[in-house]
């Protein structure tokens, strides 16, 4: 069994999403990390969950701090600025490299020419950048995107527009985070209780008894101001727009565009959250008396969005069985962080 997992999409079928990421269930992460502390936990999670590894490491640091100290983790302007840069990097990497392939294209040298001339590296750096490095890379990304206008990913958006506007998945956003801190703490405790009680909750999560989705369009900062997201097109656009917002924000933001933090729960427990490129990431930990990991759970955006009964699954079921372009368009709107493929059924002709 591959712990990394994969998803197979079946347009026009039920179930329309088959697969999972086994490492997230069966208390496997807890067993993998049991007895470890501090940097050992952080580095292991970054190596196991490699996509958006910076967010995994950040969230692990916060949850371990909150569980050991039993006080909220410190979120500094410098760490927030770094999170915004790395999230923008995640967005660009997915759009520049994944989108063309999901449109049945091979990556052509001409499509990547603007990337080869861009000083901004797509690879996540092996260490956390210093503030001056963050500022320099933000500038590099802004300069590099100036030459992206005629190329991917804007070409991909233009090619998807008609298809994506016609795809109208149901919308029930995950609203665990809240502008009211008392309500947010209650919501986080509810999730923590579910994670602790059920080792497989992170594989098939539900919020208040139903499936929910998380993404750029469900950010805490936009909860009251953002227009309703009704189409795959809205979701795809939101990712491009947020990337531009993240690299254009002040170097030391006074208001965080991405929410993150940790809540101590008592008795060596804590839960931490981080708004990352694909949506809301949650970590829960139980430490023993020596501050070593006794149990650990990670609840990632992909498990919400690729739930077999969620909005994406229902939208896939409504497609024609041979509609691979629409299936890939939907998948890109929700952006899985594990391997994903589309299974097409041949329609017999009379």
Outline where the language-model segments fall.
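Acidic, carboxylate-rich catalytic segments that either coordinate divalent cations
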Residues: 296-297
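A short beta-strand signature within small-molecule sensing/ligand-binding domains used
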Residues: 281-283
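Active-site bordering "gate/hinge" segments
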Residues: 1-278, 302-350
């Amino acid at each position: 069994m591959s712990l990394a997992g994969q998803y197979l999409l079946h347009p026009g079928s039920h179930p329309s999403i088959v697969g999972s990421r086994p490492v997230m269930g069966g208390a496997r992460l807890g067993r993998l990390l049991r007895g470890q502390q501090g940097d050992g936990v952080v580095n292991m999670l970054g190596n196991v969950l490699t996509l958006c590894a910076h967010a995994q490491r950040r969230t692990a640091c916060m949850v371990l701090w909150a569980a050991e100290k039993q006080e909220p983790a410190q979120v500094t302007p410098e760490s927030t600025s770094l999170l915004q840069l790395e999230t923008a990097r995640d967005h660009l990497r997915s759009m520049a490299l994944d989108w063309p392939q999901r449109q049945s294209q091979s990556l052509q040298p001409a499509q990547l020419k603007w990337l080869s001339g861009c000083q901004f590296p797509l690879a996540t750096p092996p260490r956390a950048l210093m503030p001056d490095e963050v500022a320099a890379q933000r500038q590099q990304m802004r300069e590099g995107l100036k030459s992206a206008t005629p190329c991917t990913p804007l070409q991909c958006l233009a090619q998807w527009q008609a298809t994506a506007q016609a795809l109208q998945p149901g919308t029930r956003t995950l609203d665990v985070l809240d502008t009211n801190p008392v309500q947010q703490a209650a919501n986080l405790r509810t999730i923590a209780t579910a994670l602790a009680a059920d080792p497989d909750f992170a594989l098939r999560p539900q919020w208040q008894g139903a499936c929910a989705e998380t993404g750029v369009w469900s950010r805490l900062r936009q909860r009251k101001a953002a227009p309703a997201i009704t189409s795959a097109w809205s979701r795809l656009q939101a990712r491009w727009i947020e990337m531009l917002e993240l690299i254009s924000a002040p170097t030391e933001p006074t208001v965080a565009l991405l929410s993150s933090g940790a809540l101590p729960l008592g008795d060596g427990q804590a839960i931490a959250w981080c708004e990352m490129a694909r949506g809301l990431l949650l970590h829960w930990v139980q430490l023993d008396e020596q501050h070593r990991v006794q149990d650990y759970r990670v609840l990632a955006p992909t498990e919400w969005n690729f739930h077999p009964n969620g909005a994406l699954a229902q939208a896939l079921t409504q497609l024609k069985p041979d509609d691979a372009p629409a299936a890939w368009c939907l998948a890109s709107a929700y952006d899985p962080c594990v391997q994903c493929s589309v299974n097409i059924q041949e329609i017999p002709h009379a």
